Amino acid sequence: MTQQEMKKIAAQAALQFVKPDTIVGVGSGSTVNCFIDALASMKDQIKGAVAASKASEERLRAIGIEVFNANEVSELDVYIDGADEITPQGAMIKGGGAALTREKIVSSLAKKFVCIVDGSKQVDVLGTTFPLPVEVIPMARSYVARQLVALGGSPEYREGVVTDNGNVILDVHNFHIIEPLKMEHTINNIAGVVTNGIFAQRYANVTIVGTPEGAKIIE
């Protein structure tokens, strides 16, 4: 079974967490694209969605789902998104698609975060397989990079990428993130950092893993 097929299995299983007459929080990325496609079957049952990226917004509108601005809603029932890495405790690294800041905002509005992944994203310690993305205001890039080196990381500028907010991304290698919540706060306190891709303060309440045997739900 291909990775794409396992993503589709996880995405399909996430529909059970979507309640009728609610506004759904939707993340971004390849697994979320599978979820948006699956959500088309419920488009007449939900009020609409809040999207964490322009790409997701366009995909939702294309299938006829109304998209609301995050400022128009006070709370979301559920937020569905993927992850680049996720631990058994639900802490994640996200931001491979450079939408981490908006993902953090929309997920913070939700009562429940449902993370949909294939098995390759499961790790015991964050930073094992994937660098940590950090969104940075352009003028602070060099300063922030030096601070990340001081923390033990090896930052790499993601060439040619500008976020939906007009900022740049540093991908930090060689972090072995034993205390995700502490590291999330430490990096966010560096002047010029918008946010980083550790999702530990807003962790996943439910993880759905697509496997060849079907969807495995971890709560």
From Swiss-Prot:
GO biological process: D-ribose metabolic process; pentose-phosphate shunt, non-oxidative branch
Enzyme's top EC category: isomerase
CDD domains linked to this entry: RPI_A (cd01398)
GO cellular component, one term: cytosol
Enzyme Commission number(s) of this protein: 5.3.1.6
Recorded catalytic activity of this chain's protein: aldehydo-D-ribose 5-phosphate = D-ribulose 5-phosphate
Pfam families in UniProt: Rib_5-P_isom_A
Coiled-coil zones: none
Pathway(s) annotated for this protein in UniProt: Carbohydrate degradation; pentose phosphate pathway; D-ribose 5-phosphate from D-ribulose 5-phosphate (non-oxidative stage): step 1/1
Binding-site positions, substrate: S28, G29, S30, T31, D81, G82, A83, D84, K94, G95, G96, G97, K121
Active site: E103 (proton acceptor)
Source organism superkingdom: Bacteria
Keyword list, A-Z: Isomerase
GO molecular function terms attached to this record: ribose-5-phosphate isomerase activity
Assembly: Homodimer.
Its job: Catalyzes the reversible conversion of ribose-5-phosphate to ribulose 5-phosphate.
Name the record gives this protein: Ribose-5-phosphate isomerase A
Organism: Actinobacillus pleuropneumoniae serotype 5b (strain L20)
Name of the coding gene: rpiA
